[in-house]
């Protein structure tokens, strides 16, 4: 049954009818105003922030849980660094990610070159050392991982250990070190660290560098996977480990042996994982808030306490456990311009596969 307001030309009834119409208009306006107030007080919930990251397993779960506790609803898409890189390139015209987190220097440099990131200076960036942020303000790095040269003192006396990566081709070390697959991030990074020592004036690897790498492969133990690498150490053949710091410590634990990290002449390659906001995100405010939270000193220190990773933010390192602070001082960093070598690395690795690695 409908309520109908009948308008008549009687002065009295017309007045009464208009009063009713005015009341309805006022009521409608009141409801509209109330709706606006409610909308302001309870804004629509933002969509979940999509974060692409190689951090998976326990580490990925920790990131997601801590982010949620801090008020950030994220969906963490986890895959290997190479797979994520390919996916981001494939999605360039229809980006699905809002934030990229935890990819290494070379990958971030190439993605940046493709124009996939937008500038943003996080709240913690002002205290970040210069080598961990780019001039464009696109990528900011938050922890570092040394790619170390280490040895087992029960197999190789301290005075006999190599002093430099370039010592490995000496006769004393033939058959004592293991070279992994070029598909592995660690292998790629120490090969880059070796080759940049032989760059000519044009930034290309000299013949001397390729000759060195020929000898390096000829005298090493080539093992494509973790099991065969571990077996080379278990058998007693290998005594020198070319590994990321955490991997070297884990391998020593698996072998129930002591390992010694070498602070090499010429420095140690150190890779850093970064964070960046995608240029195509439609959740810019949420992405900025997440990046501010993620790289903050308290979050980085908590991650360091949980997983032993060394943060690069000085305040975060100061709040980290003593063992993490000690690991930060183990080696001197080899100066490497990752942005400069990133576009060249794949061609170097291809040459190694086709012409050197047997």
From Swiss-Prot:
Single Gene Ontology MF annotation: thiamine pyrophosphate binding
Gene Ontology CC terms: outer membrane-bounded periplasmic space
UniProt entry keywords in alphabetical sequence: Periplasm, Plasmid, Signal, Transport
GO biological process, one term: thiamine transport
Coiled-coil regions, chain positions: none
Signal peptide per UniProt: 1-46
Keyword hit for Mitochondrion: no
SUPFAM superfamilies per the UniProt record, alphabetical: Periplasmic binding protein-like II (SSF53850)
Subcellular location: Periplasm
Superkingdom: Bacteria
Pfam family, one: SBP_bac_1
CDD domains cross-referenced by the UniProt entry: PBP2_Fbp_like_5
Physiological role: Probably part of the binding-protein-dependent transport system y4fNOP.
Family: Belongs to the bacterial solute-binding protein 1 family.
Protein known as: Probable ABC transporter periplasmic-binding protein y4fP
Lineage of origin: Bacteria, Pseudomonadati, Pseudomonadota, Alphaproteobacteria, Hyphomicrobiales
